[in-house]
From Swiss-Prot:
It is found in: Cytoplasm. Keywords: Cytoplasm, DNA-directed RNA polymerase, Nucleotidyltransferase, Transcription, Transferase. The lineage of its organism: Archaea, Methanobacteriati, Methanobacteriota, Methanomada group, Methanococci. Coiled coil: none annotated. This is DNA-directed RNA polymerase subunit Rpo3. Its EC number is 2.7.7.6. GO terms for biological process: DNA-templated transcription. It comes from Methanocaldococcus jannaschii (strain ATCC 43067 / DSM 2661 / JAL-1 / JCM 10045 / NBRC 100440) (Methanococcus jannaschii). One of its GO terms (molecular function) is protein dimerization activity. Belongs to the archaeal Rpo3/eukaryotic RPB3 RNA polymerase subunit family.
Length: 191
């Protein structure tokens, strides 16, 4: 049984505290899935057409990859395309990333500072992935403490891509699918 204790917005997402009556092994499975197997969007492919800034292309691409992208992936091959075109002098922020079908979680993340006459023109694609592959797809941090023999209290801090309840629901679905798959494999062995 899950009991929600507290939920509050922070400047980088949400903090979500809930208790769960379940064995420790089950609680740890939920925690691990929340961190590393719930799919989110992150910028993976970056096409740099022009970059006269002082930042190397590789560093610029890496910075873009770590900007949280809002949304829950519905399809495995779903792609969100962003474009960025800016000329200095100015500071380029995540709000300068433009898309018809996506949105950055935070508009005030500085990407690069452009001097007079410097310019960048970029196209990038955000794709679904999981934190097990790369931390840029990690939707939250999650820890728990044991408060009784069969009860733990979770503390979850999200990074803006998804709501905390969505992450928890998705983790439970993933664990359920894994358990069902395991049972099917056991049935095949018994036959």
């Amino acid at each position: 049984m899950i009991t929600i204790k507290e939920k509050r917005k922070t400047r980088i997402g949400e903090e979500f505290i809930f208790s769960l009556k379940a064995p420790i092994s089950f609680s740890n499975a939920i925690r691990r899935i929340m961190i590393s197997e719930v799919p989110t969007f992150a910028i993976e492919d970056v096409y740099i057409y022009e970059n006269s800034s002082s930042m190397d292309d590789e560093i610029l691409a890496h910075r873009l990859g770590l900007i949280p992208i809002k949304g829950k992936p519905l399809l495995e091959n779903e792609v969100i395309t962003f474009t960025l075109e800016k000329e200095g002098p100015c500071t380029v922020y995540s709000s300068d990333l433009k898309s018809e079908n996506g949105e950055v979680a935070f508009k005030n993340i500085p990407i690069v500072k452009l001097g007079k006459g410097q310019r960048i023109q970029i196209e990038c694609e955000a794709i679904p992935g999981i934190g097990k592959v790369h931390a840029k797809w990690q939707p939250c941090n999650a820890v728990y403490k044991q408060i009784a023999d069969d009860e733990v209290e979770f503390f979850v801090e999200t990074f803006g891509q998804m709501e905390a309840e969505e992450i928890l629901e998705e983790a439970v679905k993933i664990l359920k699918n894994k358990a069902e798959s395991f049972l099917q494999q056991l049935e095949m062995i018994e036959q």
